[in-house]
Amino acid sequence: MTKLIFMGTPDFSATVLKGLLEDSHYHVLAVVTQPDRAVGRKKEIKMTPVKQLALEHGLKVYQPEKLSGSSEMVELMNLGADGIVTAAFGQFLPMILINSVDFAVNVHASLLPKYRGGAPIHYAIINGDKKAGVTIMEMVKEMDAGDMIAKASTPITDADDVGTMFEKLAIIGRDLLLQTLPGYLSGKIEPQAQDDSQATFSPNISSQEEKIDWSKSARDIFNQVRGMNPWPVAHTLLDGKRFKIYAVEVVNGAGNPGEIIEKTKKALIVAANQDALSLKLVQPAGKPKMSITDFLNGLGQKLKVGDYFGK
């Protein structure tokens, strides 16, 4: 039985961890995840999905603010683990830790060398890619630059957003890891080096990138909205206040960028630089998320054709 340390944080990681826990080839000695954080409008302290799953299985959980140089890292190095598996952990692993075990592999949600970094699924959708995927790779000092053990891909449809793709890729990543890890550990699978000249990067989404630029095409804004739903969420201004947009549909229409060109009891159409967008799911400042119909029956009643978003 291979003794593992698992490192991960969100639901994506928890899916991978669950697969390892259910596979009799592996014994998870401990789990490392990000510290509990305050989330949501009420700033409630919440544990990560990985911590929740680990506690349900009685596993030892470590939550260092920074792994490098921590007492937790020293403890981890003394556990006698054979290897480390990471999946969307959210911190760099010190080389001293990687070198203390026989192997260290990462489940990365992109088709490397494309989209190294912390937001690969977001950028795949924002950029209008037709497919996304998962790469199982060796851990090295450089971010997501290790040799590739296996890859698998799946289409991105117009109905997908970050939430749906995370769910799909978590399952693909779990299955790919469990299918290929035995062959990798036995030496039957030879890792392939990445072509660094083809590498692209997907850093965490900045607050500036969350803002909708209505002078872009409707298709580009559609991809931006999907590529930020359910987090960090694309937003614009309405009457000078932040207005979040979770879902839109591209429709025919013309007007000045950001201009409301059609309003009914059930629809609000906003012009982009090319075509227009029908808003579907929104969140006005200080209010919960709501359908466009609910918005138009409430706060949105005062809006009229010729009004603008983005101001």
Curated annotation (Swiss-Prot):
Binding positions for (6S)-5,6,7,8-tetrahydrofolate per the UniProt entry: 110-113
Record's keyword terms, sorted: Protein biosynthesis, Transferase
InterPro entries: Fmt, Formyl_trans_C, Formyl_trans_C_sf, Formyl_transf_N, Formyl_transf_N_sf, Formyl_transferase-like_C_sf, GART_AS, Met-tRNA-FMT_C
Origin superkingdom: Bacteria
A Gene Ontology term for the protein's cellular component: cytosol
Pfam family, one: Formyl_trans_N
EC code(s) of this entry: 2.1.2.9
GO molecular function, one term: methionyl-tRNA formyltransferase activity
Reactions listed under catalytic activity: L-methionyl-tRNA(fMet) + (6R)-10-formyltetrahydrofolate = N-formyl-L-methionyl-tRNA(fMet) + (6S)-5,6,7,8-tetrahydrofolate + H(+)
Record-stated family: Belongs to the Fmt family.
Record's function text: Attaches a formyl group to the free amino group of methionyl-tRNA(fMet). The formyl group appears to play a dual role in the initiator identity of N-formylmethionyl-tRNA by promoting its recognition by IF2 and preventing the misappropriation of this tRNA by the elongation apparatus.
NCBIfam families, sorted: fmt (TIGR00460)
The protein's name: Methionyl-tRNA formyltransferase
Taxonomic placement: Bacteria, Bacillati, Bacillota, Bacilli, Lactobacillales
